[in-house]
Design a protein with these regions (language model features):
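Inner-leaflet juxtamembrane helices
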Residues: 69-125
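Alpha-helical transmembrane segments and their immediate juxtamembrane boundary regions
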Residues: 23, 27-93, 157-186
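Short, highly charged low-complexity linear segments
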Residues: 87, 106, 110, 138-148, ...
Length: 186
């Protein structure tokens, strides 16, 4: 097979490349999850404070209604995007022996094997170990899909941060406008 992995000299450099790339992907995923956790905490705290302190004051001061609703909506939307960035997507979890024999599955991702019998999983891993093309192809595919998941996480996080940042500015401006341009209730 021309151009196959078997023809290449797969030394320490290639192993280091895969190891480093995997580590980088895992670290970036951890960073994204930490950022999402921070946004979850901040927005949950703001929502709690607003609901406990501002919402009860709205009947006595109508000027608080619109800015409070804006702030709650912003925090809720940011919260949803933070949750979306951490929400796992798990596949069916069962690769067949035929999938393995045809090299159509990736046993390196738990979502592809968690419902398989141990014997079938073991057989599949042994098949992969015996075939370096299958092994490196699986590792490459795994890295690719890790990258796809990371891109989605960071896309949701970017939206979360933008909603929070710009929404906070709009909410503060709404509070300022409400108190500067509308008279206080009597």
């Amino acid at each position: 097979m021309k151009g196959s992995m078997k023809e290449l000299n797969l030394g320490r450099g290639v192993e280091t490349m895969y190891r480093t790339t995997y580590r980088t992907h895992v670290n970036l995923s951890s960073i994204a999850d930490n950022k999402a956790n921070i946004m979850l905490s901040i927005n949950a705290i703001i929502i709690s404070i607003v609901v406990a302190n501002l919402v009860p004051k709205i009947p006595g001061d109508y000027r608080l209604a619109v800015p409070t609703l804006i702030l709650l909506a912003v925090c809720l939307i940011a919260l949803v995007y933070a949750i979306l960035s951490t929400r796992p997507k798990v596949t069916q979890g069962r690769a067949t022996r035929e999938d393995i024999a045809q090299k159509r599955t990736n046993l390196l991702f738990f979502g592809n094997f968690y419902r398989m019998d141990l014997a079938d999983f073991h057989w599949g891993m042994m098949e992969m170990i015996k075939d370096s093309d299958f092994l490196y192809s699986s590792m490459t595919r795994d890295l690719y899909y890790l990258g796809v998941v990371l891109a989605k996480k960071y896309q949701y996080l970017r939206i979360c941060y933008n909603v929070f940042m710009y929404g906070l500015i709009v909410a503060v401006a709404a509070f300022a406008a409400a108190f500067l341009f509308w008279p206080a209730p009597v």
